[in-house]
Each structure stands twice: as structure tokens, then as C-alpha cells.
């Protein structure tokens, strides 16, 4: 988030300059992705995204349009993502309680009177609006039961309003897009706009495109706030001009920013909480100029009020984070980006002498929580003294305090930050290790179903304990004994402690599994190629169990994993062992597939299209978790998007529709970029939440297995540069992209409903879908998409047949699904 209400204030005062985009010809432009995406996806765009899930397709359209103009003017964009969150940001996002407070507010509040809009966090606003959307839709369904037969009811209440879309949710999709199209990107250790400032100061880039927070950095003179591509112009802010017009010092400006709320301190502090958000900065500035208000001093003077201690700490942490923010430097290390301060030459020499006497800064002299008010006064008085005495001034970095971990976070190894910077890991597990909390936040469908909560509980043994052990084992022993808890939004006061220490460690149980092929240098990793490699072995134990581990430094380079294919294949096999798709025993020299693994290894033999292999694995793992049968109603029951007329008149066919829509949540419709506004279905979305949860956990477990291999030294890490890591490894990682939306599932749902009520007339049913989903613009090849999705159902039917033969699913479910697919075949071919 940017400094609250500052941008509109600057526009009103005419402090935002404009210039022809030609001025950026041949320059390297660093772009803050979070700020950039917030400008592309404004409040009126993608308002129903939370009701269908998936990647916002309109974002790709805007992105492609902008990149074309960048290319026309030979501008080299570098996209920088946010990394970890500081303590203030974690608290504001509800990290430590898994957004349980926000979820409870949204579940009990349906009007804007629930909390003050000024004090409400973005998370609260998102969940509140989502709850309003579903409440209004449920009411529409109930009130239209008598008239609703076969034409779906369109939602009226948007699911997103006055909230920003967090780009981190789509980070992996954006990174995949940038890699595919050859654009540079980076994930910052923490704040992206600080990383931009570092790169600008180091002369690696020519300009930055970032939020108004950049005004708090005195090392950034100018920055681009926005692009007006239709007019071939860009909007920029000149810091010196802004400060001159505001009539306040830089320190006073920071004081105002910390009070109204900004990226480093998101909470609006007293006494500003009573004012409307659009007027916050204007009112705060007026208070400073007219009455000499110092907002930090105000917090200190109201210690008897509720939350006063918390407000003081929030302010102090915000100031401290501004002064000491970690960035990824050109050395490859993550170090603090410490801004310089102006001192007299005499004081500088005195401090240097004192520094030699004591190697450690005392908490009292270098504490990050030192009074900002005192600092402001001191700086001002020192400045006057220097001017009067004409003492020579010098710039020197601030002393680094010894409590940075209290307001930023604990330090992880530099190698971990490197893997995060290239998008190899999403970073959620890293955040859990740093904070001691892995939050399970409410999914799009609310997560109220018993089966979803059961899935969350089961994930501890299936995924989380293994992931935490794999990631903490290679690093400082402190993290191996540090308590890390899974905190669930529906039971925040009953956290589950994850297991850090195991004997033997998780890595020791799998590090003898090695996949090496002779032609691996030419291969690109895919699940299909992996299956071919495994099935090509006549003796899995002999071919894939190594007598000796390959991670010690004494092992020659040529004996290690030297190709991306071998690296990813080795760790994918280890993943399948941890998921119990394979049985592995090093002492017994045993490696063989379980019944689940046998079905998986038949995917090529069954001629399952390789692009569906990942979806099939997600489906298999979901069935293996056994939390919800494919034909089972969720509890408590969710309202169906089918009409009561359909449910009463066609009970058997309605069950077919249920199975079909659930499976099709794994299928992504090929649609053109558009802002979706069409039918929604909470029952289908809830099932999608289950599969999305499985996919996210599969991704994190594979990340943990891969990181454990890399940090141990099994792979020749120097064989790739940054671009090589992106193109040859990150690009081919499985389970990275966001789960499909529910559009194709709903298209089939309402197609079949119309088909049943309209005398089995296929064309009328397709016309209904085209009209209701506005496919003339978004999906012009509607017939092809129905054929392709039907082919996907036939592929899943083959897998179900194998599962039934292996007695891994209930035979009644298999028969029911077979009939459901036959029903779709009849409807589509009529």
C-alpha cells in the first residue's frame, strides 16, 4: 500500500508532473509490481474474481499492451516483487492469527458499520466484501426460486470494492509470463520499493516506477508514479518540489506518513482515525503546519488510552524499518540498506573513535526504538548550529541497531534469499520459519465446510512437518528447535505445533534417491518425461538408488546432478516417495510404486495428454486424502446454483452435474482477457478450494525437497547464471501456477440444466451459455472449449477406471462418474 490519501492530495495540489514517454527512450526502468498491478486492476476491474478464482485474465491484456509500448520506445523494464513482510505488515495482514479476526468480522457483519473504514485493514475489507457478495447472491437465489428454472441468476453485489489486489497471489503466474517473454524480474527480500531505491542508487537502472512511499526516501529525488499510455505520457513526482510546496521538513513528512498509514506502518494512528480516508493526509499536514503537531509525541502523551502502547510500537517499528530495510545487493548477499545522515566532521571523528573502543553498539545508543521526535529536534538544532558556525558537514551511514530482528524479522541464509529472488520458492514457508507461524487463512469459498477443515488438519502430517524439517535441517540449529505453529483462521487459539526435528531427518531418508540420464542435457523437465524415464527402468532400485550420497564436497562435480532435468527428476521422485506413491527402503534396496504410484505411472500408457498430468496428480492426491467423496455433499450444505425445479425434476442428472462440475474445476477454459461478470456458484467454488489447497501444498513440498537438495550441494549450482536458473529450472517447476477458475465447470452446469429443461436441444443450451457468460468476447471458440473439456472428462474417466481396478475408490462413485460422462457425451453429440 502507498501513503494513505497522499496521491490524490498531490494531484489536487498540481504536484504530479507529466512528461512525454519519449524521455524514457533507451532507459532501464525498475517497476514495483505491487504498485503497478494496483494501477492496472483498479476498483472497478475484476470485481467478481473472488467468486470464480483463478488468474485475472484482464491483467495479461493490460500487461501486453504496456509491454508493447515499452518495446516501441526501447525501454527495458525490470519487474520487482515484494518479498517477506516486516513485523508491522505481518500484524496488519493478520498473519499471526491467520486473519481469524477479519474472518469473524466478515461472517458477522453485512453492512459497512462493522468497523471504521479508516481503521479497517485491506484483509478485513476483502473478506467483508466477499461475505457481502455471497450473502446477496444467496438472497437472490432464495427470492427467485419460484421463477428460476433454467436461466442462471446473475450476481449484483461485487466481490471486490475499494480494495487492492495483492500481486503476491499471482506472483508465480506473472513470473512464468516474464520468463516466457524474456523480461527480467526479481523478488526483493522484503519491500520492493526499497530494492528499487538500492538499484537506482547503485546506478544499475535509470528510473523507478513506484508508490508514494518512495517520498520517504531522501535518496530518491524523482520517481514515476503512473503511466498514461494512451497519451504517451508518464506521471512523475519530484521530491524537492513536493517538500517545498508542503512547507514541512522531510522528518515532519515522515511523521505524517507514519500517522496516516503507509506500507511500513499500515495502521492509521490517533487522532486521525476519526477522519475519512480521502482527507487523511490533508488533515494531518494542516495539524502539523498550524498547530505544530508531532504525531509521535501525541502517541507518547496518550499512554492511558486503549492501544496506546501498540500505537507507539507500530510507529517505532515503521520508522526503524524505514531506516534499516534489507535489500539484495550486487554481492549476492542480503544486507541492510542504511540511508546516510548529515553530521559535522567533528562529530563523525568522535563517533569513529568511540566505535573503535566498543565493537558493539549499545542498545541505548543505537536502538532502533529511539525517539523519532527527539531525533527530529536534534537534527533540526544540529542543522542550525552547523549553519551558524560554518562547520564542515559530512554524510555517514546510521549506526545499525542490535534489534533489527524485532521490527524486520530473523535472518535466513543468503542462499535462501537467492532462491526466493528468482522465484524458485513462493516464500510462505520461509516466512513461517522466520515468524514461527504458518497461517491457514480462509479460502475464497469461506472454508466453513467440515471436509476443508479436515484437509487442513491432515496437511500437518502429509505436508507441513516434512516441509519444515527439510528447510530447517540445513540451517542454524536455532531454527531446528524453534517452535513453529500452524495457525488456522477458524481456531486461532488452538494452533498445531509442527515437527522441526526428526530422527533421521527427512532429507536423510530420501537422499539416496538419484535420477541421472545420459541425454538429460537435451531434455526439458515435464511429468510426462519423468514417467517415461521411470518406466524405462527394468530395475528401479538398481537405477535410482545410489549407494553413496552425492552432496559432500569430496564428491567430484561430474558425479553430482549436472543438468536441470536430473535435478528436477530426482526431487520429483523424492516428492512421490514422501507422498507414498512409492515405497522406498535403502537398507533393503527397495523402490517400487504403491497402488497410487502404479496408476500414476500409467498416465503415458493411457495416452493422457501431458498438459493434464499435473491436474491428474492433484486429483489423485485429493482422493488419497479421503476427506470428501466425489459425490458427497459438503457439510454444512452449500446452496446449489441449479434451480429447485432441476433438483426436484432431475435428481439423478443433478448428481451427474455435481460430479462433472467438480472434476472440471481442474480445467482452465481458454478465454480472452476480460473483466468477468457472469454466473457464479459457491458449491463449485468450495470444491475448487479443496483442489487449490492440495496444489498449494504440493508446490510447497516440492519446493522444500528441491531446496534441501540444492543447499546440500547435490547440484552444480555454478553451472547456471540468473537467467539460466529462470529459463531452465523455474520455468519447468510443477504446481506453480494458480488453479483454474470455475468458469468451464459452470458453463457445463448451466448448459446441462438448459439441455434438460429444453427438450434436449443442444443449440439452445449453447446459446444460453454464450449469452449468460458473454462468450462472444471472452470465449469466441465456445464449441471447441466444450469439446476440449469433454476430452478432459474422458481422460479423467480413464484414470477413474484404473483407480477402480486398483480398489482405490468406491465402485459406486466410479459407476456414477462413468454415467455422468456418458450423459455429457450424449448432450454434446445431440
UniProtKB/Swiss-Prot annotation:
Observed effect of gene inactivation: Normal vegetative cell population growth rate and morphology. Decreases expression from the HO locus.
An example Gene Ontology CC term for this record: nuclear periphery
Compartments it resides in: Cytoplasm, Cytosol
Keyword terms, alphabetized: Cytoplasm, Isopeptide bond, Phosphoprotein, Translation regulation, Ubl conjugation
Signal peptide residue numbers: none
Bias (Basic and acidic residues) ranges: 380-400
Annotated segments matching region Interaction with PBP1: 130-380
Gene3D superfamilies: 5'-nuclease
Span list, region Disordered: 347-400
Pfam families per the UniProt record, alphabetical: MKT1_C, MKT1_N, XPG_N
Compositional bias segments (type: Low complexity): 361-373
Coiled-coil intervals, chain numbering: none
Alphabetized InterPro entries for the sequence: MKT1_C, MKT1_H3TH, MKT1_N, PIN-like_dom_sf, XPG-I_dom, XPG/Rad2, XPG_DNA_repair_N
Keyword Secreted: no
Domain of life, per lineage: Eukaryota
Family of this protein: Belongs to the XPG/RAD2 endonuclease family.
PANTHER family: FLAP ENDONUCLEASE FAMILY MEMBER, POST-TRANSCRIPTIONAL REGULATOR MKT1
Function summary: Involved in 3'-UTR mediated RNA regulation. Binds to RNA-binding and RNA regulatory proteins. Complexes with PAB1-binding protein to promote mRNA interactions with poly(A)-binding protein. Promotes mating-type switching in mother cells by positively regulating HO expression.
Note: Present with 3430 molecules/cell in log phase SD medium.
UniProt protein name: Post-transcriptional regulator MKT1
Amino acid at each position: 500500500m502507498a501513503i494513505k490519501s497522499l496521491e490524490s492530495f498531490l494531484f489536487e495540489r498540481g504536484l504530479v508532473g507529466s512528461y512525454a514517454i519519449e524521455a524514457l527512450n533507451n532507459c532501464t526502468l525498475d517497476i514495483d509490481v505491487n504498485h503497478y498491478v494496483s494501477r492496472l486492476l483498479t476498483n472497478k476491474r475484476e470485481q467478481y474474481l473472488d467468486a470464480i478464482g483463478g488468474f485475472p485474465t484482464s491483467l495479461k491484456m493490460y500487461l501486453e499492451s504496456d509491454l508493447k509500448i515499452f518495446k516501441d520506445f526501447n525501454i527495458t523494464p525490470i519487474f520487482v516483487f515484494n518479498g517477506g513482510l516486516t513485523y508491522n505488515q505481518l500484524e496488519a495482514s493478520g498473519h499471526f492469527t491467520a486473519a481469524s479476526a477479519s474472518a469473524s468480522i466478515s461472517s458477522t457483519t453485512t453492512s459497512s458499520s462493522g468497523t471504521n473504514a479508516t481503521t479497517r485493514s485491506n484483509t478485513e475489507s476483502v473478506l467483508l466484501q466477499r461475505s457481502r457478495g455471497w450473502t446477496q447472491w444467496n438472497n437472490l437465489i432464495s427470492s427467485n426460486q419460484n421463477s428460476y428454472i433454467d436461466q442462471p441468476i446473475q450476481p449484483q453485489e461485487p466481490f471486490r470494492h475499494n480494495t487492492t489486489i495483492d500481486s503476491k497471489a499471482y506472483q508465480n503466474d506473472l513470473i512464468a509470463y516474464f520468463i516466457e517473454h524474456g523480461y527480467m524480474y526479481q523478488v526483493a527480500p522484503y519491500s520492493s520499493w526499497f530494492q528499487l531505491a538500492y538499484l537506482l542508487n547503485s546506478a544499475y537502472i535509470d528510473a523507478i516506477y513506484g508508490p508514494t512511499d518512495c517520498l520517504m526516501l531522501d535518496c530518491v529525488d524523482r520517481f514515476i508514479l503512473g503511466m498514461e499510455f494512451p497519451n504517451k505520457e508518464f506521471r512523475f513526482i519530484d521530491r524537492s518540489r513536493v517538500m517545498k510546496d508542503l512547507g514541512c521538513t522531510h522528518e515532519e513528512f515522515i511523521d505524517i506518513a507514519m500517522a496516516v498509514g503507509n506500507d511500513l506502518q499500515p495502521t492509521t494512528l490517533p487522532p486521525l482515525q476519526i477522519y475519512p480516508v480521502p482527507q487523511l493526509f490533508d488533515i494531518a499536514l494542516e495539524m502539523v503546519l498550524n498547530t505544530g503537531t508531532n504525531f509521535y509525541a501525541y502517541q507518547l502523551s496518550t499512554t492511558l488510552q486503549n492501544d496506546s502502547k501498540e500505537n507507539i510500537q507500530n510507529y517505532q517499528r515503521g520508522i526503524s524499518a524505514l531506516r534499516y530495510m534489507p535489500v539484495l545487493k550486487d554481492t549476492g548477499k542480503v544486507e541492510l540498506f542504511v540511508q546516510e545522515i548529515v553530521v559535522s566532521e567533528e562529530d563523525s571523528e568522535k563517533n569513529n573513535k568511540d566505535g573503535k573502543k566498543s565493537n558493539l553498539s549499545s542498545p541505548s545508543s543505537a536502538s532502533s526504538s529511539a525517539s523519532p521526535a527527539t531525533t527530529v529536534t536534534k537534527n533540526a538544532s544540529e542543522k542550525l548550529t552547523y549553519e551558524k558556525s560554518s562547520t564542515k558537514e559530512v554524510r555517514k551511514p546510521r549506526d545499525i541497531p542490535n534489534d533489527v530482528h524485532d521490527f524486520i524479522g530473523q535472518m535466513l541464509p543468503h542462499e535462501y534469499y537467492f532462491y526466493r529472488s528468482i522465484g524458485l520458492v513462493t516464500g510462505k514457508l520461509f516466512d513461517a520459519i522466520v515468524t514461527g507461524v504458518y497461517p491457514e487463512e480462509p479460502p475464497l469459498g469461506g472454508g466453513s465446510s467440515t471436509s476443508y477443515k479436515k484437509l487442513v488438519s491432515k496437511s500437518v502430517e502429509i505436508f507441513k512437518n516434512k516441509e519444515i524439517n527439510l528447510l530447517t535441517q540445513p540451517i542454524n540449529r536455532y531454527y531446528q528447535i524453534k517452535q513453529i505453529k500452524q495457525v488456522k483462521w477458524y481456531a486461532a487459539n488452538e494452533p498445531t505445533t509442527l515437527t522441526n526435528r526428526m530422527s533421521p531427518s527427512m532429507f536423510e531418508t530420501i537422499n539416496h534417491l538419484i535420477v541421472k540420464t545420459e541425454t538429460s542435457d537435451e531434455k526439458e523437465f515435464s511429468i510426462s518425461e519423468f514417467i517415461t524415464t521411470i518406466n524405462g527402468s527394468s530395475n528401479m532400485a538398481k537405477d535410482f538408488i545410489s549407494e553413496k550420497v552425492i552432496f559432500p564436497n569430496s564428491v567430484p562435480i561430474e558425479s553430482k546432478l549436472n543438468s536441470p532435468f536430473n535435478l528436477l527428476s530426482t526431487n520429483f521422485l523424492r516428492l512421490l516417495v514422501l507422498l507414498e506413491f512409492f515405497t522406498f527402503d535403502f537398507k533393503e534396496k527397495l523402490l517400487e510404486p504403491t497402488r497410487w504410484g502404479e496408476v500414476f505411472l500409467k498416465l503415458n500408457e493411457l495416452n493422457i495428454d501431458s498438459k493434464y498430468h499435473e491436474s491428474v496428480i492433484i486429483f489423485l492426491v485429493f482422493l488419497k486424502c479421503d476427506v470428501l467423496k466425489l459425490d458427497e455433499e459438503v457439510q454444512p450444505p452449500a446452496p446449489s446454483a441449479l434451480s429447485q425445479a432441476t433438483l426436484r425434476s432431475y435428481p439423478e442428472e443433478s448428481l451427474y452435474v455435481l460430479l462433472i462440475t467438480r472434476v472440471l474445476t481442474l480445467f482452465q477454459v481458454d478465454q480472452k482477457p476480460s473483466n468477468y461478470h457472469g454466473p457464479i456458484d459457491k458449491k463449485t467454488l468450495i470444491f475448487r478450494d479443496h483442489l487449490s489447497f492440495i496444489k498449494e501444498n504440493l508446490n510447497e513440498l516440492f519446493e522444500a525437497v528441491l531446496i534441501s537438495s540444492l543447499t546440500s550441494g547435490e547440484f552444480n549450482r555454478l553451472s547456471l547464471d540468473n537467467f539460466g536458473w529462470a529459463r531452465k529450472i523455474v520455468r519447468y517447476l510443477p504446481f506453480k501456477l494458480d488453479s483454474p477458475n470455475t468458469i468451464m465447470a459452470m458453463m457445463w452446469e448451466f448448459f446441462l440444466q438448459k439441455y434438460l429443461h429444453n427438450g434436449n436441444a443442444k443449440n439452445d443450451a449453447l446459446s444460453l451459455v454464450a449469452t449468460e457468460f458473454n462468450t462472444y468476447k471472452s470465449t469466441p471458440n465456445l464449441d471447441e472449449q466444450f469439446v476440449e473439456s469433454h476430452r478432459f472428462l474422458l481422460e479423467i474417466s480413464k484414470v477413474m477406471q484404473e483407480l477402480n481396478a486398483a480398489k482405490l475408490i468406491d465402485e459406486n462413485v466410479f459407476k456414477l462418474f462413468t454415467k455422468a460422462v456418458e450423459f455429457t457425451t450424449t448432450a454434446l453429440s445431440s
